[in-house]
Amino acid sequence: MSRKVTKYSAVLAVSLFAAALAGCGSENKEGTVGTGPGGVATVGDTACVQCHSAVVDPLTGESIITQYTRSFHYSKGVGCEGCHGGGAQHNGVGPLPFPLAGQSEAQIAARCASCHNGVIAPLSSSPNFVNGNHANPFGGEEAKENLCSRCHSHEGAIFGAQAGFTGDGNILRNAAYQPVYPQDPETFNVMTCATCHQHGGAQRQVFTQISTAGVPNSRRTVAWDPNRNSINDQYDLCTSCHTVNTMTGTLIGSGNVLQIFTSNAVGSGTKSVTTAPFYHNTRWFRTLPSTHYDFPESKTTASGTTIEGYVIRRNTANPCFDCHGHEFQTNTRRLAGADRPNTIFLDWGQSAHGGKLLQAKVAAAALASSGAAEVDDVMKAGATDATAPGWTHYNWDDTASRGACQRCHTSTGASNFLNNPAGYDRTGAGNSFTHLAGWTSSNKRSDQNELLYCWGCHTKAGTGELRNPGAITEVYPGINSTSTGTTGLDVTVSYPDIKGSNVCMGCHLGREVGDNIKAITDADGILGFVNSHYLTAGGQLFGTTGYEYATRSYANPAFFQHDKIGTAAAPGTGTNGPCAGCHMTTPTSHLFLPVTKDGTGAITAITSTACVTCHAGTFALTPEGLTAEEEEYVASLEALKAALAGKGILFFNAHPYFYRDTNANGIADPGETVSSNAFTNWAGVYGLALWQDVMGAAFNANLLIHDPGGYAHNRFYSKRLIWDSIDFIFDGVLNNDVTAAIDAQVTAARLDSATATAAKAYLGATRP
């Protein structure tokens, strides 16, 4: 038999010890007689235990019955016969429908796969494991070496865990700690299900060795418990090889003392962080904290931070399965390469949802010196305001100051909202961030920040199962201010059920819509700008977010289909709605980009299958054509900004976004872009009766400037909002003089002629 077949068979064979969840086998461990899997009557666990209590784990010597009683299967009432079939014909010597011994590899594999197929038992998916790195290590010969076998072989992992050969490099490199294996490592095998799981499926216990400093002969073996919760849990098991911190809490790294830059309102400097050496402490991609730790010390502004890595929820039941399931193959050592096939993890690490964190890590590694210095530099690299302001700019988990933002700027808030939109507390009071360093129920703040992690959108990363908020009904709160005497009513918008894309809608609908302005009562039209917030593509898609001028129609043309992508109304575009249909039907689905771009921002390829499916033949899209439309869209917004500047309303891309042009030069000068100079006198442009229409033009500009894909999401809606806003703000009348309005900005030197030409090409000579 080939070695490959033997390995595959061994992987699946051992998983028989954990083969059934409720519903797979029908046998009850309490002894109720019935028909078990295989059609043979059952006799109950008591009869099995009578003979098999003396059978022991061949590597640890522990009773398999003792192991089984610690398992999830036992606690859920799935007994021996749930895997092995009814025992009425067995009696110690007779047949069992599904015995372990004497069966062919194909029979054993088929039996295990009946439950461990990624569907019935999604958290224990045998196919994912078989195709992952644990069953297929990069260097198979590492399993044959005495020291390396601790984490690169089945037997070595079990023997080492039992002997307390677990911890940082100081332990693993110390000959006194190394166990004497009862068999030659040359006979060791690659990892199987039973490397981590005992008979019945419970996690194996891991031990380490500790000693008291200065006390001779004080070394002793204790349970490996780096999250210090006195529970044998998944964090303990996984970090026994993928070590994050020592038993005393010291961060794993190169072993050097890191200097972490910090800055706050008082001043700036560095803070020292001691690391313990990992065994592989000279390559960043072999040291887990290089990507799985966020330094709370790294405050880069009074309120912002650098996010150096993912924060593990250490004390939850499945902290590693939050993202990995049994996949175990990330391929994140580099950004690309034929020898590193694409994975969801590779995509996410380069995406905006992931703060482009992996790009920062790979770039730091490329510039670093080799060895421990590489590990240090990569550990300190991270997402910043330059690449990920939505995650780094504020301390989003600070409930007192940012609770209302947590729904979309933290994974915790996003997951809680998507689980129960109607019951979600908008103040953030119901969000717990106890997995972040220093966050408690009393202070409710931490200097670590989250990105949008897998578990923010998914309930089960192993299967990709999404959270299910249902169709989103968004309540946009009314605008009220006692200081300006402003009152406003809530605006409620019910969006259609778009299946998996409902998850996206949870954060891409904006915080205010144009109708919020119309719902305001204000005595003098002097008030702060109503801000749509960022990336409101879902609202644009369904034509609900903009400020719509009276007498003008904003209904989609009959042939408009973008809001139907991913539904039965648009065959061939998927079943998960328009957001997923366009942004996730690409070879790099979790980059969330339907196109690729070069370094200049030009579109080089259209990768979304939805785009290609619909835009064929006469309506085929080309990268060049789409790039031109994007450029013209941006130009039209520049024209709108110029028209607003002509009325003394300057746009600057920082809250509150619109400022007074105090020197009437049409340029947002540094001294003008301060909050004390915010534009507030909307009635001063065309009178009190029209103040809402004036703010509406500014609202539409801000809305679409912050939707860079607005030219594609719903180009008809976007064009009409821009057209009407320019039309009105130019002379206070809706009279379709947009071409003249744009030309006037060129004459006034607020817009260059090339941009004006592109804007007119995008909007056309008549209202879209």
Swiss-Prot record:
Residues bound to heme c 11: C579, C582, H583
Main location (coarse class): membrane
Physiological role: Not involved in Fe(3+) reduction.
Binding site for heme c 5: C193, C196, H197
Membrane topology summary: Lipid-anchor
The protein, known as: C-type polyheme cytochrome OmcC
One cellular-component annotation, GO: cell outer membrane
Gene: omcC
Residue numbers with lipid attached (S-diacylglycerol cysteine): C24
Binding site for heme c 1: C48, C51, H52
Induction context: Not regulated by Fe(3+).
Residues annotated for heme c 2 binding in this entry: C80, C83, H84
